Every structure is written in C-alpha cells, then in structure tokens.
C-alpha cells in the first residue's frame, strides 16, 4: 500500500494566535514495498512528517491516504485504531519506552493491546524477537539488563509483533556503535524482504545509501526533492549547501579528488565504487 500526502499543511496550535506552521504544502508519494529515507537538516520537519503516518498528528489542512484509510484534521481518535494496527512506529531511542519485567512480556504488550489472545501474542512476540535476532536466552531477562543494541532490537520487536504492514523508524541507528548500526541496517533490509514498506529518518547519508530505494528531502517544512539515492546524491554541490546536507563519504572524497584534478565520470555513492573508478583512471593514464 502506497502512502500519499495530498496538500498537507500542519501547524501546532492551529487556529490560535500562537499557531506555529511546521509543514507546508506537502505533496509526495511513499511507494509500496520499498525503503524510503527521509533526510534533511534538524528542524526541517522530518519528525512531524512521520507522525502523520499513524495519526499521532493530523493534517491541519489536506489529507494523508494510506490504502483505503484517509487521515484528515476532523478524524476522531477512536477511528485511528485500524491505522495504528497497520503502521508501526519506532521512535528515536525506543529503548526508553521499555517497561516490562521481561523481554518477552515487553514485546507481547502491543499484540495484546490490539486484541490478540495471550497465546497468540506470545507466539507473535517470539516470532518478532527472532526476526530482529534477539536470542532465546534473553527472552526471560529484564530488558534493562541488555546492551544498548539489544534493547534497541527488543523495542523494534515490540512494534513488529503486531505485524504492521508499514514500519516507521525515527533515527533507528542513533547512539549505536558501528556493530549495532550494521545489525540495525540488516534488520531494515530484512523488513523489506519480508514485504514491509519501511520509512526511516536518518542524518547518516551512508546509511541512506546502504538501505534506501527512495529518498525524500525536506527543508524548512517542505519537500524539496525526491528520487532514488543516485538521483539525489548526484545533485550539484550548491544544492547540498542550500539544504544543509552532507554527501555520503564516497561523494565527499570524490569531490576532494576532483579539486585535485582527478576526472570522475560521476559522483560515486560507495567507497568501493570510488576505488573502482580510481583504478580505471589509473589504467587509462
């Protein structure tokens, strides 16, 4: 199921003298079956944008269409249950939301909340824990005894246990060490392979390159570009300065080499790609 934002505007305190406009005239489609990265400088509206995906926020004007569900400003809270069953949200530092006595009990909470019988909730929780590579020996431990990376995976399992079609991740790799980041990106790839639509916010462009099929760029509350990683990261340097974004590491190195006289046919996205281009350049000298 694709997600369509149609003429979406959002203001905190809408209709008051203290209204604070955040999102402006958002018209964008998040394609089904892909991993979409939302990027942009701090304060560009990314978190506000994704909170419209499961009705934590509702458009001040316009609408968000997810399959047959239409989110508008006048939708009642009681009508959001079906949307939230379809759209799972994992917030930044989700381990702060862990609360139960054991890992398994924590992950069972969401499916029970959505009406699963206890036995079904336990099966769903165990399936989700396996999906994010949390070993069985940890299931009966307190989640607060785990490492940061393990806690992050348990929190993700809590969202996956109710089997949503859409997974939304706010800075999923924030605060993790390199090993934890690598494991997290592997989980994102696995979610796509399982047929999920994945949306994630990231400030790390190399993570975007590693897993995203589709990229949405936000700046000052609006969508200023969208496309494949190749399309986005081959825009000119002036544009990147305008939207206050960095290039991936390979792109940064490539620009430094260009300034030193190297001729590269395009801006590489991966360091391995850059190495190949330099080897080709050397062979033609």
From Swiss-Prot:
One GO MF term, please? ATP hydrolysis activity
Lipid bilayer topology = Peripheral membrane protein
Which InterPro entries does its entry note?
Answer: AAA+_ATPase, ABC_transporter-like_ATP-bd, ABC_transporter-like_CS, ABC_transpr_CbiO/EcfA_su, ECF_ABC_transporter_ATP-bd, EcfA2, P-loop_NTPase
The UniProt entry, under SUPFAM superfamilies, shows: P-loop containing nucleoside triphosphate hydrolases (SSF52540)
Keywords in alphabetical order, please.
ATP-binding, Cell membrane, Membrane, Nucleotide-binding, Translocase, Transport
Location comes to: Cell membrane
Domain of life (superkingdom): Bacteria
Domain ABC transporter as annotated: residue spans = 3-245
The answer on whether this UniProt entry bears the keyword Coiled coil reads no
Q: What is its EC number?
A: 7.-.-.-
Cross-referenced Pfam families, in alphabetical order? ABC_tran
UniProt-listed Gene3D superfamilies: P-loop containing nucleotide triphosphate hydrolases (3.40.50.300)
Protein role:
ATP-binding (A) component of a common energy-coupling factor (ECF) ABC-transporter complex. Unlike classic ABC transporters this ECF transporter provides the energy necessary to transport a number of different substrates including 5-formyltetrahydrofolate, pantothenate and riboflavin. Expression of the complex plus FolT in E.coli allows 5-formyltetrahydrofolate uptake; 5-formyltetrahydrofolate is not taken up in the absence of FolT or the EcfA1A2T complex.
Its assembly, as annotated, is:
Forms a stable energy-coupling factor (ECF) transporter complex probably composed of 2 membrane-embedded substrate-binding proteins (S component), 2 ATP-binding proteins (A component) and 2 transmembrane proteins (T component). This complex interacts with a number of substrate-specific components, including FolT, PanT and RibU for 5-formyltetrahydrofolate, pantothenate and riboflavin respectively.
Listed PANTHER family: ENERGY-COUPLING FACTOR TRANSPORTER ATP-BINDING PROTEIN ECFA2, HEAVY METAL TRANSPORTER
Q: Which family does it belong to?
A: Belongs to the ABC transporter superfamily. Energy-coupling factor EcfA family.
Q: What is the recorded name of this protein? A: Energy-coupling factor transporter ATP-binding protein EcfA2
Q: Which gene encodes it?
A: ecfA2
């Amino acid at each position: 199921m694709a997600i369509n934002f149609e003429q979406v505007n959002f203001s905190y305190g809408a209709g008051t003298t203290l209204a604070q406009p955040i999102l402006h005239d958002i018209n964008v489609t998040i394609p089904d079956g892909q991993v979409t990265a939302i990027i942009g400088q701090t304060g560009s509206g990314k978190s506000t944008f994704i909170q419209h995906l499961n009705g934590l926020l509702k458009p001040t004007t316009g609408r968000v269409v997810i399959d047959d569900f239409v989110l508008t400003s006048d939708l009642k809270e009681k009508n959001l249950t079906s949307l939230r069953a379809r759209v799972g949200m994992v917030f930044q530092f989700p381990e702060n939301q862990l609360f139960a006595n054991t890992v398994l009990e924590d992950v069972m909470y969401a499916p029970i909340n959505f009406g699963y019988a206890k036995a079904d909730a336990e099966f769903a929780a165990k399936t989700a824990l396996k999906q994010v590579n949390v070993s069985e020996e940890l299931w009966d431990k307190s989640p607060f005894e785990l490492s940061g990376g393990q806690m992050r995976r348990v929190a993700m399992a809590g969202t996956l246990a109710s089997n949503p079609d859409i997974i939304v991740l706010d800075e999923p790799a924030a605060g993790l060490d390199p090993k934890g980041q690598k494991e997290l990106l592997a989980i994102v790839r696995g979610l796509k392979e399982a047929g999920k639509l994945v949306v994630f916010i990231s400030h790390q462009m190399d993570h975007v390159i590693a897993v995203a099929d589709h990229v949405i760029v936000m700046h000052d509350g609006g969508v200023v570009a969208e496309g494949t990683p190749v399309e986005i990261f081959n825009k000119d340097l002036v544009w990147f300065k305008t939207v206050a974004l960095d290039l991936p590491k390979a792109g940064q190195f490539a620009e430094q080499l260009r300034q030193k006289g190297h001729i590269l046919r395009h801006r590489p996205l991966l360091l391995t790609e850059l190495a190949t281009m330099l080897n080709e350049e050397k062979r033609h000298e």
